[in-house]
């Protein structure tokens, strides 16, 4: 389906036009809004959720990766310890909303972050040739959940890694008001010498809605996809937690999965209406180091952590 309308950026992004409303009362009143318009054009929304996977030969395969099918595959991989995989003693992860690669300096920052990461979780990713070449040059493989296609280029969330996942699935949910989807990638990675796998969730959460229904449904779907996973989990991304009610939804999902949020002593995460939007939650992992890195190359500051498997 092709939807010809203004392509709307995230509510919190820098723009000459800002949404004006009493957002703390958002669920009680449908407030008039002015939205930051990026460009006008035609956005293609595929009938089925669209996933893109980089193959071992460098080609890109487009397919549907429904989580209902993939979860059983991931569970079947828990058999014997693997000789190859992520180092369970040192897992370096970074999550970053890259703002559609629209800010100066993103290439230099991404190159640095990719070199220092085992897992790179990107949101608002435009899968153009420049981005693909940079990830390839970093020696990483990737899988993407496409939210929509604009000017024949996919935009969505992308997980890049130094080790190929044993399984991945994608989820997509449509924003209630803007009708543009938000997406998630869930991947299961082998851990060297371990029988279990590490589940990694990369989420760009719904931003613009009058109620919490769709927002809660997005997190419920992720929880359901992880219901059979007994091993460690990383749950991260731009969760758009700009109200206390949204934070409560995320906390409830985290509680169901036994997740703990990583804290930051020097917290440089960007704020929107007094709340951080970018988070990393974990289960079965110890935090060795964590930080939020101040940048000018996006409207979000990347968040990183070094983790190790809990013994």
Where are these regions (language model features)?
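Structured beta-strand-rich core segments of catalytic domains in phosphoester-bond hydrolases
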Residues: 52-80, 119, 123-197, 293-294
């Amino acid at each position: 389906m092709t939807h010809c309308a203004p392509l709307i950026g995230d509510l919190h992004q820098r723009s000459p036009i800002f949404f004006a409303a009493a957002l703390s009362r958002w669920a009680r009143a449908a407030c008039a809004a002015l939205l930051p318009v990026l460009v006008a054009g035609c956005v293609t929304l595929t009938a089925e959720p669209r996933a893109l996977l980089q193959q071992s030969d460098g080609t890109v395969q487009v397919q549907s990766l429904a989580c209902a099918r993939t979860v059983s595959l991931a569970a079947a991989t828990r058999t014997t310890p693997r000789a190859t995989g992520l180092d369970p003693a040192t897992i370096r992860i970074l999550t970053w909303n890259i703002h559609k690669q629209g800010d100066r300096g993103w290439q230099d920052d991404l190159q640095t972050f990719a070199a220092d990461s085992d897992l790179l979780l990107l949101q608002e990713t435009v899968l153009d040739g420049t981005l693909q070449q940079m990830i390839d040059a970093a020696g990483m493989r990737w899988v993407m959940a496409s939210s929509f296609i604009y000017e024949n280029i996919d935009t969505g969330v992308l997980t890049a890694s130094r080790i190929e996942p044993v399984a991945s699935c994608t989820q997509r949910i449509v924003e209630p008001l803007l009708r543009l989807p938000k997406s998630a990638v869930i991947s299961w990675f082998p851990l060297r010498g371990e029988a279990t796998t590490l589940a990694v969730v990369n989420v760009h959460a719904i931003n613009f809605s009058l109620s919490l229904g769709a927002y809660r449904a997005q997190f419920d779907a992720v929880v359901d996809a992880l219901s059979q996973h007994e091993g460690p989990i990383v749950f991260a991304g731009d969760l758009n937690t700009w109200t206390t009610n949204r934070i409560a939804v995320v906390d409830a999902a985290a509680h169901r999965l036994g997740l703990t949020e990583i804290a930051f002593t020097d917290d440089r995460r960007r704020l929107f209406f007094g709340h951080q939007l970018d988070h990393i939650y974990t289960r079965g992992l110890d935090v060795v180091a964590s930080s939020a890195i101040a940048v000018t190359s996006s409207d979000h500051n990347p968040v990183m952590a070094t983790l190790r498997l809990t013994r």
